[in-house]
């Protein structure tokens, strides 16, 4: 019997394929199944011997999978998949609609408790790694301000939201941080910066033939939780140009905390940054690390939804507590 953590992937897009690659770098994990809405016979995985199962048959895999990593989009997939799968499996997901995290957590929590499973939600880099750094820096510098900047890079969640607009064939969205706002945040002066002042959003959209471009642009710019709070530019281009100039998926960003200690005379700036060649592959690597934590928590008898705030760092590592103290402390 295998002692490896048996992982399933639900959704075989950019994140799903990234998870498959990340599993290859984690010897204590193995991929046993990919779940898809497509005809399973048309899906070719990178790993030999992996079952491809239609998502409607997920329940048949309950005894074969330790942790299911949900790789759907946050706009419409995960609000349904999250609770549905949490009742059947221990799950990890990258739900990233910040404004809706509390209600999503509650829905997944109820389902996970019903199924006696562990579900860690909103895992990735933001929410995820950036969230943890916001918490650490705020706890250390309680008198201060924090600032989060994303980009320049392609946002998967916002690109997914664009592609779901009626009349859109394909699209990518770049998040662009303001250099002036970043410099002000790093200065230690604790400026007040609005959402609109910190970033702009630029969309490259391929419209379907005959689609109403004005309606598409209006829908995108007015989309709540995604574009309505930002200065957004919508560029209509051909599929060929999108494929040629916008096929890579770089991203990154900064979490900055500026605060004071003593009697306010000493200023401090904490900064955490990421520069990513592949947003989906990095996100997937975080998901796999948290799958290890979910597996361990479930083995210890825990259940319900968790966020990255609830997970002790040592649970993410394949190393023993002794190894961690010796090598990293």
Predicted feature residues:
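C-terminal substrate-binding/catalytic lobe of Rossmann-fold NAD(P)-dependent oxidoreductases
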Residues: 6, 18, 25-56, 154-291
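Hydrophobic Val/Ile/Leu positions in short beta-strands of Rossmann-like dinucleotide-binding domains
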Residues: 7-9, 70
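Glycine-rich Rossmann-fold phosphate-binding loop(s) that bind the pyrophosphate
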Residues: 12
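Hydrophobic/small residue at the entry helix of a nucleotide-binding pocket
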Residues: 15
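Rossmann-fold NAD(P) dinucleotide-binding segment
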Residues: 58-67, 75-94
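Oxidoreductase and adenylate-handling cofactor-binding alpha/beta cores
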Residues: 129-145, 160-170, 293
């Amino acid at each position: 019997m295998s002692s490896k953590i048996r992982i399933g992937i639900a959704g075989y897009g950019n994140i799903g394929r990234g998870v498959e690659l990340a599993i290859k770098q984690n010897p204590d994990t193995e991929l046993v199944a990919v779940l898809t809405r497509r005809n399973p016979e048309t899906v070719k995985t990178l790993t030999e011997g992996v079952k491809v199962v239609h998502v409607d048959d997920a329940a048949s895999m309950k005894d074969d999978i330790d942790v299911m990593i949900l790789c759907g989009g946050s706009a419409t997939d995960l609000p349904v998949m999250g609770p549905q799968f949490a009742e059947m499996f221990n799950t990890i997901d990258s739900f990233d609609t910040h404004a809706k995290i509390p209600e999503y957590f509650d829905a997944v929590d109820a389902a996970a408790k019903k199924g006696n499973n562990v579900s860690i939600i909103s895992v990735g880099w933001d929410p995820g790694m950036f969230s943890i750094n916001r918490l650490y820096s705020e706890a250390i510098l309680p008198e201060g301000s924090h600032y989060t900047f994303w980009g320049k890079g392609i946002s998967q969640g916002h690109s997914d939201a664009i592609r779901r607009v009626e009349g859109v064939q394909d699209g990518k969205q770049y998040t662009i941080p303001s250099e002036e706002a970043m410099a002000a945040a790093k200065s230690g002066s604790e400026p007040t910066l609005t959402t609109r002042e910190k970033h702009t959003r630029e969309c490259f959209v391929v419209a379907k033939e005959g689609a109403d471009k004005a309606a598409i642009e209006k829908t995108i710019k007015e989309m709540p939780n995604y574009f309505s709070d930002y200065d957004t530019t919508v560029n209509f281009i051909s599929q060929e140009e999108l494929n040629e100039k916008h096929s890579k998926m770089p991203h990154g960003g900064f979490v900055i905390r500026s605060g004071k200690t003593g009697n306010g005379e000493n200023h401090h700036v904490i900064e955490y940054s990421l520069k990513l060649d592949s947003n989906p592959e990095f996100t997937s690597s975080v998901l796999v690390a948290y799958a290890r934590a979910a597996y361990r928590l479930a083995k210890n008898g825990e259940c319900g939804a968790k966020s990255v705030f609830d997970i002790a760092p040592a649970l993410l590592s394949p190393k023993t507590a002794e190894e961690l103290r010796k090598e990293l402390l």
